[in-house]
Amino acid sequence: MAIILGIDPGSRVTGYGVIRQVGRQLSYLGSGCIRTKVDDLPSRLKLIYAGVTEIITQFQPDFFAIEQVFMAKNADSALKLGQARGVAIVAAVNQELPVFEYAARQVKQTVVGIGSAEKSQVQHMVRTMLKLPANPQADAADALAIAITHCHVSQNAMQMSESRLNLARGRLR
């Protein structure tokens, strides 16, 4: 069993999603958004750090998964996003959590089956996969999709390791 915290970082809205993985079964534990309504960036970063720390304390995750930075057209936006990611990662590292990063395209490919999927498609698939009564908010859905991606990637890595071990022992042909 593992609890995974997924984070969709943003300097104004940071989505989070928490799921439990038992074997191949995924279950929803919680999700939402950390909204920073102050104008100055240092105060927003402080709120993101405090919010992520509070979520970690509440859910006690085993793994922390976050979206990688993509190259934005606006350099200022990309820098702010990078800073938001940074404080979220520091919150995880301060709690001794292992950090995993996934590209947005990989997340969409894993959850929807198309790397260029729309936000509404991600929301629908997250709702379906986690058996939710309604679509989660867009940023929370993205964070849940990041957590789901971590489960799939880690499950595949474990299966590959077991296959290699069995091959080395002469059990696979």
Curated annotation (Swiss-Prot):
PROSITE patterns: RUVC (PS01321). SUPFAM superfamilies: Ribonuclease H-like (SSF53098). One of its GO terms (molecular function) is magnesium ion binding. It is an enzyme of class 3 (hydrolase). Its main location: cytoplasm. Its cofactor is Mg(2+). The RuvA-RuvB-RuvC complex processes Holliday junction (HJ) DNA during genetic recombination and DNA repair. Endonuclease that resolves HJ intermediates. Cleaves cruciform DNA by making single-stranded nicks across the HJ at symmetrical positions within the homologous arms, yielding a 5'-phosphate and a 3'-hydroxyl group; requires a central core of homology in the junction. The consensus cleavage sequence is 5'-(A/T)TT(C/G)-3'. Cleavage occurs on the 3'-side of the TT dinucleotide at the point of strand exchange. Belongs to the RuvC family. This is Crossover junction endodeoxyribonuclease RuvC. It comes from Escherichia coli O139:H28 (strain E24377A / ETEC). The gene is ruvC.
